[in-house]
Amino acid sequence: MEIELIRKNLDGIRIERRGGLQKRFRIVEPDLQPNETKDKIGNVGKVVRLQSNFTKFSVNKSEKYIMYDTTFSKMGLSPKLKLQILVRICKEYNLPGSFCYDGRRLFTSDNWTEGSDIKEFTIDEKKVSLRLVSTFLSDTEEYYQMINVLLNNLQIIMGQEKIGKGYFLGSNSNKDNVVKNIGPTFFETNNFKVLGGFGTTLQRGTRPNGQLTTLLYIERINRVLNDNSVLVTYNRKNIDQLIGRDILTKYNNKTYRISEIKEMNINETFEMVGRTLSYAQYFKERYNINLTTEQQPFVLTRVKKIARRDKRKEHNENEAPEDMDLTLNITGELCFLCGFSDQEKSNIDLQKNLGCVLKRGPRERLDDIPSFCDWIKTNNNSQGMSNKWGLKIDNTPLEIEGRELPHCDVISGGQRINEKIKDDWKFGKVQFNVQKGVKHEIDVVIVDRNDSQYGNFLNDVEYEIKQLRFDAKIGRVLVCSANDVERSLNDVMRSGSGCAKIALVFVPDDRVYAKVKSFTISTGLLTQCVTTRNGTNRNDKRRQVVSSKTVMQIFSKFGYDPWTIDIKMRPTMIVGMDTFHNKGSKKSIHASVFSINSTFSQYMSFANSPKGKQEFHDTLSGNFKAALTEFKRIYKILPVRIMVYRDGVGDSQLQFTKQFEVDAMKPLVENIYKENGCQVPQIIYVIVKKRIGTKLFNRGDNANPGTIVDKEIVKPNFFEFFLVSQRVTRGTASPTNYNVLEDTRYQNKAGIIEAITPNELQRITYTLTHLYFNWMGTIRVPVPVHYAHKLAELIGKVHKGSTPALINERIRNRLFYL
């Protein structure tokens, strides 16, 4: 029984014996693709030659590599100082081979402990102990970790500092001490610093002939830092805007997230290792910093302390120490905000000033690889380490083969409304297919303003309605204060006149917006919000653009499609899933949307905040059952294929997602189909990743929408592809990564079992990027994923950590979150 359980848990994972003294087994990266996957490369579309931000890479090969755990006798040393000590040890003890160090683990190409497991070295009365952990070969997971550590060490040696997870110019850099025209960039304006750096990652790739290869990803990265401390920017009225923001503490270059802000005195005390210290004492003794303001805001940040586990003493899981959540109190004058607030993001002048650094074009990005190579070659500090390792980096971007998928015809009113050379279309060509005999009424709610200021906007709305030939009118106009907005919305609900009704609400701020949307979710009254700024805009062109989008959103919420795309395939339900993590709370909102029509334009929506795996499975089961029941009510059959697009999952979470989401979902769906006496459907589960560093270029410019790459830069153990679906007018277009975790395959009437082909999957995915009814063009991800994201974000921001209300059944099948 135990052997079978072990075999089941290790199914799909390749295991190899590792060398070295301990003779243990090493788990290699699992094969995260559907069973019996044979064909992963498509062939439809025009073949194009592309460039990427990957390049070829090599180091001197060794028979084996060794990993050590390090212990330093002196506490509190920074990784940079530890690295310098290890460099001295290597020289003074004449240790063989090359090495790199990540702050805890030491990787070497030769043995430093001379046959024993543990050895101790001494430099300037500082003792360093090495304990052998493992030995490994090249082209293993440990090897890739080691090379990534080597590249990080090179950046430290060349003067970079670790800030968060990346390596950048130091936080105290200024324009006078930054080398120009080579290496990391630096920019300063409006109390903001943009600290430059390089992101580097080694990963597996596949050559055109199918052989494995090693590729190096290189890209310039930036960190935006506000020169004003939290002490300067803080006031009691803006606490909500600061909660959830990231801060940097310059004394140790660490980043934290603000969980809470509390006014305290720097002479207040706390316990630390048997001593009672004031905050002023602590920062003076530890960092030689004199705090200047006695009473000031303190940033409270929650961090997880990982318990140190001694595997030699632990015999079962109950004996293992538990991780703990700790709260750190940091004085506001030492905390500097990272990134932008919502107000700063909407500051056009500020974003324009920083755009030259943050939104670089494709031709500038193509220079990243040669710039990084030149920086290493011309930096004297890096030569010793790079020469020892035999480091070779090709200074030209990797050329790869891609394809441009055929154009999709966007249909509205029976006619194609998009041009074949473009990926967007105009509002004037849109014709809604409105149900005859149904009247529509739009009641207006104006918050904290005089109704006469909105006359021009309402006239624009009426004009757009006439252009679209809707049987609709603007009804009552209600004016109220922010505190009475729910009462006015109740008046709109009670004034039922046999019409399909929606409330057009002009909101002055996010607080009122949250009230309106909370009312929508709980009562089922459709609402369309417009900001006060847009509703009172005196610029005719800008106001008319907003009014046309507003009308399109209103009638999309009524359940009408402004356009469609013909997707010919067997009866299919497409599901979008995403998770919203509230920065100021531990609660997460899991949203899922299920297509309930053949054109994949209308969706049934669910939002849950499950606690634990069992509750997640229960809510997932209930959501699938309700959506499949609705699908059957409409079409009299259940779908023969279910395609799930799942966002919000990183590479490190793929194994967990496959085990606890995919493998749990399959029996849930099977049970529902068996209860209905139907054949189990084909289930396809695709992970969608937007936040990736990969860039694709076509002849020095952005890749065209519809560009697919499914070879060379894809991982050999994944069934994945990259798709550029959106055109950008400024900066560089980013592809989206799609990774197929599961395909249960389909059994046709002849009994033949078929997997989805790469061509079909890529075509469906690209087509679904055309169906977002808040933008007359393509978007970066398939529309169900984007709708799930919009829904999760709306619920998360409205409820801010509290348990979300159930979505009212009146709007569950409507796009109320547009």
UniProtKB/Swiss-Prot annotation:
UniProt cross-references to SUPFAM superfamilies, sorted A to Z: PAZ domain, Ribonuclease H-like
GO biological processes: regulatory ncRNA-mediated gene silencing
Residue ranges occupied by any Piwi domain in the UniProt entry: 501-800
Higher taxonomy: Eukaryota, Metazoa, Spiralia, Lophotrochozoa, Platyhelminthes
Domain of life: Eukaryota
PAZ domain span: 220-339
Pfam families: PAZ, Piwi
Gene: iwi
Designated name of the protein: Piwi-like protein
SMART domains associated with the record: PAZ (SM00949), Piwi (SM00950)
GO molecular function (one): RNA binding
Similarity field: Belongs to the argonaute family. Piwi subfamily.
Keywords: RNA-mediated gene silencing
Keyword Flavoprotein found: no
